[in-house]
Amino acid sequence: MAVSAITGARLTLGMSLSSSTRSRTVAMAVSIDPKTDNKLTLTKSEEAFAAAKELMPGGVNSPVRAFKSVGGQPIVIDSVKGSRMWDIDGNEYIDYVGSWGPAIIGHADDQVLAALGETMKKGTSFGAPCLLENTLAELVIDAVPSIEMVRFVNSGTEACMGALRLARAYTGREKIIKFEGCYHGHADPFLVKAGSGVATLGLPDSPGVPKAATFETLTAPYNDTEAIEKLFEANKGEIAAVFLEPVVGNAGFIVPKPDFHSFLRKITKENNTLLVFDEVMTGFRLSYGGAQEYFGITPDITTLGKIIGGGLPVGAYGGRRDIMEKVAPAGPMYQAGTLSGNPLAMTAGIETLQRIKEPGTYEYLDKITGELVEGIIEAGKRAGHAICGGHIRGMFGFFFTEGPVYNFADAKKSDTAKFARFFWGMLAEGVYLAPSQFEAGFTSLAHTSDDIKKTIAAAEKVFREI
């Protein structure tokens, strides 16, 4: 196994062992019928999804859940606990999606549920300040190097919207730089060469986004320092902020090259531009202080979500005090939210952060995730597949391509049709992966060595079959 130059970021690079022609289409329509192509009984899920499509656009409330990029129809979940989930047909799965990242201590944790029960006795929403906001704010500020003040919101999208408005208000500039394949929520200015569901659907952006909304958004390939230099040269004194996922999770799992973050920190300082780390996914996931602590780079503004709400809707943005004091009511930059700082999300966040602060958390996540990724990659190579992948702590991913993968263009070389077959094969073996090649996976403290062994055994079987 190859080890990247980034400490702790293990990258396993598989060589091509197959001469078969592979599809390069990002949003390939894969024809799969779970009734014939899989061993699962999904009758109730099929009925529920058919009804859902008459009630909600596409039958879901977030596009990737519809299984568009893997074909077939989605499973409908009944319950979750620990590392497991059960669909309404009674099928059990080892879960590596973790509600797309929040479930770092496992699903439906007893301590979190008990704390939520006590909080609910006092009410579910106040629309006024509560002490729980102070407690979670103190935990976040103590943990994250860049954050001296924090504002809670209700989603990662809201957090990035707030950070964008704040960066523009603070600098008096309008242009921003984002990276191809990086996803910062569904706000108009960010839907330019975006990742996550946009990548899954194969859309370069989204209909309904006016040109004016994205006119000030500049893009560059991830890990491409030369492209960034050219953008700064061509837009001197105009760039308010550089936004990035410090580790990409919304175009698959892509790590930064060793000097990429330090380059961005240097060039932004030289140009009086703010550096914004979107740590909605990596915050409290790569270390207790997030990716910025892990890599030793301090941005000006950080966005958070997922883990800080312990599975409830939440988001946050924070940064240096002089920047954050621009936010109303301390300053002139307006942003508000009816349910921001609600007691339930604050409670779940407090319980979760206190748990993962305990010694050994990240060492354990690194150990089990490393075993998982190594096992899957080695099984794929033995079966003759081109595959590469890697992990940092409890975040991982793999691509059906020779690799290495340093940006979205590299990621799009992955054989998405093969991924779809692998996804359904693993699902039939009781393993739930993200239903898209272009999403990262997650482990939790609830995952056991036995879970990892079962998953690798399932992968070995599926790789032989596909």
Curated annotation (Swiss-Prot):
It is found in: Plastid, Chloroplast. It comes from the Eukaryota. It is an enzyme of class 5 (isomerase). Strongly expressed in leaves of etiolated plantlets independently of light treatment and, to a much lesser extent, in leaves of mature plants. Its main location: plastid. One of its GO terms (biological process) is protoporphyrinogen IX biosynthetic process. The keyword Chloroplast applies. Keywords: Chlorophyll biosynthesis, Chloroplast, Isomerase, Plastid, Porphyrin biosynthesis, Pyridoxal phosphate, Transit peptide. Its EC number is 5.4.3.8. GO terms for molecular function: glutamate-1-semialdehyde 2,1-aminomutase activity; pyridoxal phosphate binding; transaminase activity. One of its GO terms (cellular component) is chloroplast. The modification N6-(pyridoxal phosphate)lysine is found at K306. SUPFAM superfamilies: PLP-dependent transferases. It catalyses: (S)-4-amino-5-oxopentanoate = 5-aminolevulinate. The keyword Membrane does not apply. Its cofactor is pyridoxal 5'-phosphate. Pathway: Porphyrin-containing compound metabolism; protoporphyrin-IX biosynthesis; 5-aminolevulinate from L-glutamyl-tRNA(Glu): step 2/2; Porphyrin-containing compound metabolism; chlorophyll biosynthesis. CDD domains: OAT_like. Residues 1-28 form a transit peptide. Belongs to the class-III pyridoxal-phosphate-dependent aminotransferase family. HemL subfamily. Homodimer. This is Glutamate-1-semialdehyde 2,1-aminomutase, chloroplastic. It comes from Glycine max. The gene is GSA1.
